[in-house]
C-alpha cells in the first residue's frame, strides 16, 4: 500500500522490479513525514533562500513586446544557483536522502543541468555523487560535465542504446537496484515511479507560488496564461501546480518538435505518442509500431526524453492544460531574439516556451494579454551548440 495516491487518473503507478519496492516505500514515508516536519521545511527554505538565491525575479520584457498590447514576463529560474530550476528539488531530495541515512546519491542527466545541481547539493551536504549521462550528451554538454567533476561527482558515460537520457535513466535504475541500502536515486524530473512525480512537483511548486504573488503585486491580477517547456516536465509542473485551481489561467506546455512532427525526429509524446509503460510509470511515450521505446530528438538535450510526467498526461487528458510543440528552428529564433532584445541568454529548453509565447503575440498583436514564461535555465551551456549551427548557416 502507498501512503499517497500513485496515480493521476490512469497515469503514473509503480512499475519497478520487486527489489526496489522497499526503497520506494522508504522514500515515500520519509517524504510524507518531512512535509509535516517544521525543522525539515525550515532547513529546505533556508537553503533555497541563502544558498540557491530564491525568490527569483519576475522580469517584464518591454522590448520584445514593443508595438503590441501584450505584457510578457519571464520567471527567472536562470538566475538560480546552478543555472536552472533543477537546483530547487535537488536540494529537497538531497535533504531527504540525509534524513534516510543514505551516504551516496545516484542521478541521471541529459543537458547536464540536473547533474550539476546534484553535484553541488552533494558537495554542500557531504554526499558521494555518481551521475549517469548518455555518451552523446557528454559530448554536446562538455562544460557541464567539467562542472560536475569539479564539484567531486563521478560522471559515467552511457554508450548503450541511443546514448542519450533514456539510456542514462536505465543505467541509473540498474545501479540503484543493487545499491539502494546506501544510495538514494535522485531522479531529475517529475516522471518515473511513484512517489517521484509527486515529490518533484512539491519541491518545485515554489516557482508557481512565487510567480502568483509577484504578478499580483505587479499587475493586480492573475496572468492569462503561463507557459513552460516540457521534457519530463518538472519546471512546467512547478509553474503549473499553484495555478491548476485558477481556471481563468491557461496552462500551456511546450514539447520539442525537433525537425518537425512529420519527420519523426521530435520529443513530443504527449501529443504524438502512445500510452505505454516505461521508466517505472504508465504514461504517453514515443514507441515503434511493435511497442519498443523510440528515440526522441531535440536540439536541447534536456528535452530529449521519449516520455512525459504522468501529471502532465492527466492535465492533458482532462483538458486543463494545453500542450503544443515548437521546432528546433523556432526555438533557435526565440533564443536569438531574447539575446538581442533583452540581453538575456536563455537555455534552448526554455527557448521553446518563449517561442510559443512569441507566436501567440504575433498572432494577435492587438490583444491585451498578460503572459508569463518560465525561463527555466540560462543558455551558457548551449552557446557552443548555437555557435556551430549559426556558423554552418553563415550567420556569424
UniProtKB/Swiss-Prot annotation:
EC number: 4.2.1.20
Keyword Signal recorded: no
Cofactor annotation: pyridoxal 5'-phosphate
Gene3D superfamilies: 3.40.50.1100
Record's subunit section: Tetramer of two alpha and two beta chains.
SUPFAM superfamilies reported for this sequence: Tryptophan synthase beta subunit-like PLP-dependent enzymes
PANTHER family documented for this protein: TRYPTOPHAN SYNTHASE, TRYPTOPHAN SYNTHASE-RELATED
The protein's name: Tryptophan synthase beta chain
UniProt keyword terms in alphabetical order: Amino-acid biosynthesis, Aromatic amino acid biosynthesis, Lyase, Pyridoxal phosphate, Tryptophan biosynthesis
GO CC field: cytoplasm
CDD domains, A to Z: Trp-synth_B (cd06446)
Keyword field contains Amino-acid biosynthesis: yes
Organism: Pectobacterium carotovorum subsp. carotovorum (strain PC1)
Pfam families from the UniProt entry: PALP
Catalysed reactions, as listed in the record: (1S,2R)-1-C-(indol-3-yl)glycerol 3-phosphate + L-serine = D-glyceraldehyde 3-phosphate + L-tryptophan + H2O
An annotated Gene Ontology molecular function: tryptophan synthase activity
Lineage: Bacteria, Pseudomonadati, Pseudomonadota, Gammaproteobacteria, Enterobacterales
Pathway stated in the Swiss-Prot or TrEMBL entry: Amino-acid biosynthesis; L-tryptophan biosynthesis; L-tryptophan from chorismate: step 5/5
Residue numbers carrying N6-(pyridoxal phosphate)lysine: 86
Family (UniProt): Belongs to the TrpB family.
Reported function: The beta subunit is responsible for the synthesis of L-tryptophan from indole and L-serine.
Gene, per the UniProt record: trpB
Amino acid at each position: 500500500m502507498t501512503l499517497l495516491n500513485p496515480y493521476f487518473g490512469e497515469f503514473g503507478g509503480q512499475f519497478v522490479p520487486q527489489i526496489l519496492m522497499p526503497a520506494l516505500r522508504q522514500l515515500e514515508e520519509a517524504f510524507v513525514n518531512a512535509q509535516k516536519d517544521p525543522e525539515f521545511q525550515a532547513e529546505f527554505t533556508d537553503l533555497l533562500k541563502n544558498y540557491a538565491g530564491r525568490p527569483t525575479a519576475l522580469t517584464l520584457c518591454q522590448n520584445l513586446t514593443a508595438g503590441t498590447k501584450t505584457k510578457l514576463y519571464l520567471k527567472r529560474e536562470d538566475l538560480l544557483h546552478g543555472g536552472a530550476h533543477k537546483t530547487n528539488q535537488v536540494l529537497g531530495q538531497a535533504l531527504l536522502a540525509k534524513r534516510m541515512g543514505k551516504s551516496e546519491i545516484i542521478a541521471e542527466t541529459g543537458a547536464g543541468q540536473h547533474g550539476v545541481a546534484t553535484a553541488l547539493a552533494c558537495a554542500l551536504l557531504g554526499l558521494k555523487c555518481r551521475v549517469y549521462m548518455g555518451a552523446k550528451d557528454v559530448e554536446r554538454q562538455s562544460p557541464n560535465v567539467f562542472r560536475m567533476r569539479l564539484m567531486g561527482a563521478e560522471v559515467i558515460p552511457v554508450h548503450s542504446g541511443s546514448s542519450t537520457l533514456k539510456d542514462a535513466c536505465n543505467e541509473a535504475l540498474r545501479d540503484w537496484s543493487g545499491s539502494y541500502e546506501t544510495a538514494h536515486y535522485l531522479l531529475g524530473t517529475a516522471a518515473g515511479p511513484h512517489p517521484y512525480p509527486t515529490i518533484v512537483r512539491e519541491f518545485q511548486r515554489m516557482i508557481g507560488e512565487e510567480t502568483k504573488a509577484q504578478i499580483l503585486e505587479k499587475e493586480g491580477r492573475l496572468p492569462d496564461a503561463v507557459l513552460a517547456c516540457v521534457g519530463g516536465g518538472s519546471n512546467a509542473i512547478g509553474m503549473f501546480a499553484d495555478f491548476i485551481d485558477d481556471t481563468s489561467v491557461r496552462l500551456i506546455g511546450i514539447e520539442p518538435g525537433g525537425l518537425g512532427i512529420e519527420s519523426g525526429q521530435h520529443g513530443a509524446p504527449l501529443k504524438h505518442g502512445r500510452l505505454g509503460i516505461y521508466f517505472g510509470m504508465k504514461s504517453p511515450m514515443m514507441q515503434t509500431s511493435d511497442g519498443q521505446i523510440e528515440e526522441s530528438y531535440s536540439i536541447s538535450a534536456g528535452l530529449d526524453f521519449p516520455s512525459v510526467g504522468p501529471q502532465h498526461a492527466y492535465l492533458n487528458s482532462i483538458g486543463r492544460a494545453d500542450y503544443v510543440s515548437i521546432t528546433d528552428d523556432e526555438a533557435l529564433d526565440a533564443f536569438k531574439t531574447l539575446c538581442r532584445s533583452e540581453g538575456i541568454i536563455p537555455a534552448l529548453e526554455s527557448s521553446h516556451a518563449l517561442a510559443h509565447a512569441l507566436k501567440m503575440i504575433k498572432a494577435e498583436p492587438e490583444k491585451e494579454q498578460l503572459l508569463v514564461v518560465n525561463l527555466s535555465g540560462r543558455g551558457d551551456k548551449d552557446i557552443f551548440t548555437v555557435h556551430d549551427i549559426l556558423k554552418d548557416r553563415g550567420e556569424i
